[in-house]
């Protein structure tokens, strides 16, 4: 980030847009092994985004604004990464694994529905974590 962007109005939104684009790619790559990795990385990503947004705008809410703008891009990339992995694994394998874990028969269609529901929950957790950590990082950076 250049020196001319420090303290300018709208800087947190710009940072959020940039980090949202980066987050889409990062989210996709880190979620290929599974959604849990995407949830964990969302915290680190939110911290970086919040600090940069706070430097860009120097307002108390800049971390929150940057995180809220970046979160949808990260969530979309993360969800796409998990979907790609699930399609490679296949619904039959997911159903077999769920059947073994739950001790009951799960059809491929039911397994796919459970998987999609888990993606929605994962995306919500990622958004909450990313925005919360980004807000805290922004406040912490402005406090220094």
Model-derived regions, located:
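Juxtamembrane/disordered regions of integral membrane proteins
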Residues: 1-144
